[in-house]
Amino acid sequence: MNNIPIFPLSSITFPGGYMPLRIFERRYLDMVKNCVKDNTGFGISLTNNIDNEYYDIGTYCKILDWEQMDDGLLGITIRGKSRYKIVNKVVKDDKLIIANVEMMDEPNFADIPKELMPYSDFLKNILEQYPKFYHDDAPKYFTESGWVSSRLTEILPMELKDKQVILEIEDYLVRLYRLKDYIDSKKNI
């Protein structure tokens, strides 16, 4: 088990995903400083907007880049590395959450079945039209169900709680079929 700082957000990322963040609270500025100094990461857990609580399953992320922004805030770019489950946690005096987590195994690699390839093509078209959704120079795996389901979940305008459900699903193909149902339900709107 690992102890990691937790950054509760009203946003979600998956392993392999990129996310820009603007840091301004002292506890998180200190967290970022320590992560950069120690070459470690932190956890992103989705807030559930009830009692300032957050989900136990989240994504462990590493900081790729940081910069002082024009408005004085710290800008960082993170990349999701692996999912975790919080076993227990403590809240430090500065309100930073430190959690003891179990890193979760990712499902086995699975190619996308032929009947789901149109959803991979859908993702490819989105990323060609809107490259800001994913780093231009990052590798793209349009035939791999885990990568496609993760990127689709990150960019689709789904309810955050529904994205969390996808993050918690252990099987990449089940994730992709769930996303297929979501996309198909929106085609006639």
Label every model-predicted segment.
Residues 1-189:
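N-terminal low-complexity, acidic/polar interaction/targeting segments
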